[in-house]
Amino acid sequence: CSCYPDWMAIPGSGCYKYVDTPKTFEEAESTCRHFSPGPYGFGHLASVHSTEEYEALASMVPGATDSWNPQVFIGLRLIDGVSPAWTDGSYYDYQNWCGNDPNAHPDGYGAFSGGSYCNGQWVDVHTFTNDQFPFKCKLPCIE
């Protein structure tokens, strides 16, 4: 798997970039979509499909600053609070939720929680709060 400079390759999964500039979920997805490796497809917020992929992405999250932070958006939407869907349209076949999450907000987004409480597991974030977090983008490999 070949990637652009400053992107991390995970063989069999894709290319990943940690973006430290906090944005809302929708702004982050839009930013990721602007990354495009030409004919190979568009970027999206990162989807996660295996323990190996999760561990590689978790290693990109800075160390804990408190019980919950840093929180980092991934490309997971929660429809009706419980139905997860990846922004890239891929199959939801892996999960790593913290505690009782997702806990039935009307709608929500998924984020890594790098703080000491969840230690990198996922938390759900209310859509109505317009929280801004750093985020992870994913691109197809450049072949």
UniProtKB/Swiss-Prot annotation:
- Span of domain C-type lectin: 11-138
Record keywords, A-Z: Calcium, Lectin
Gene3D superfamilies xrefs: Mannose-Binding Protein A, subunit A (3.10.100.10)
SS bond list: none
Q: Which PROSITE patterns match?
A: C_TYPE_LECTIN_2
Q: Does the keyword Calcium apply?
A: yes
Q: What does this protein do?
A: May be calcium-dependent and galactose-specific.
Q: Which PANTHER family match?
A: MANNOSE, PHOSPHOLIPASE, LECTIN RECEPTOR RELATED (PTHR22803)
Q: What is this protein called?
A: Lectin 1
Q: Which organism is it from?
A: Stichopus japonicus
Traced from the root, the source organism's taxonomic lineage reads:
Eukaryota, Metazoa, Echinodermata, Eleutherozoa, Echinozoa
